[in-house]
Amino acid sequence: MASRDLRAEVDFVLLQLLGDLEQLEAKRQALNARVEEGWLSLSKARYAMGAKSVGPLQYASHMEPQVRVGTSESQDGLQKFWMVRAGTQTPEEVGSREAALRRRKGLPRTPEPDSSPAPQNPLKWFGILVPHSLRQAQASFREGLQLAADMASLQSRITWGQSQLQELQEKLKQLEPRAP
């Protein structure tokens, strides 16, 4: 009876693993399409504005990231990745500010300036009126970043599923008597 339950669990984990692999392949194809679309839109923008108008010479001297990758690990060791826009606070950052002492009496303090103001839109490096294709390129690459984070989470889940499947198969081998 235990062997039957173990086989059912192996089947469930295997089906889940195959579903995750199918999702990963679909996301890879979508990522490839977004990146290809982004580069094509970027080349259209270079054609519209001139080859020297869209290039490294227009980049800001000091760049700030617009997104970060957030990670978390669940109790079973499964990691999850997601995109966090710059300027938004994570729960850890909010909690640390509230724990600070407050001065209730005396001179009013001047508010502390934010150490990290929201970063400027990089499209403004290329002028005020940028072609629509440049905006499309930016949107395509942003979607690609989100897909990459989703793919990393899926890959982590696939690795976890493979280890679960191997453990279950080892248990199943120990339960079944060896036939000559």
Curated annotation (Swiss-Prot):
Gene behind the chain: VMA22
Location relative to the cell: Endosome; Lysosome; Endoplasmic reticulum-Golgi intermediate compartment; Cytoplasmic vesicle, COPI-coated vesicle
Gene3D superfamilies with a match to the protein in the record: 1.10.287.3240
Record-given protein name: Vacuolar ATPase assembly protein VMA22
GO MF entries: unfolded protein binding
Stretches the record annotates as Disordered: 89-123
Pfam families, sorted: Vma22_CCDC115 (PF21730)
Stretches of the chain forming a coiled coil according to its record: 13-38, 152-176
Physiological role: Accessory component of the proton-transporting vacuolar (V)-ATPase protein pump involved in intracellular iron homeostasis. In aerobic conditions, required for intracellular iron homeostasis, thus triggering the activity of Fe(2+) prolyl hydroxylase (PHD) enzymes, and leading to HIF1A hydroxylation and subsequent proteasomal degradation. Necessary for endolysosomal acidification and lysosomal degradation. May be involved in Golgi homeostasis.
Subunit structure: Accessory component of the multisubunit proton-transporting vacuolar (V)-ATPase protein pump.
Protein's GO biological process: cellular response to increased oxygen levels; intracellular iron ion homeostasis; lysosomal lumen acidification; lysosomal protein catabolic process; vacuolar proton-transporting V-type ATPase complex assembly
Keyword field: Coiled coil, Cytoplasmic vesicle, Endoplasmic reticulum, Endosome, Lysosome
GO cellular component, one term: endoplasmic reticulum
Signal peptide range: none
Main location (coarse class): other
Top-level taxon of the source organism: Eukaryota
PANTHER family the record matches: COILED-COIL DOMAIN-CONTAINING PROTEIN 115
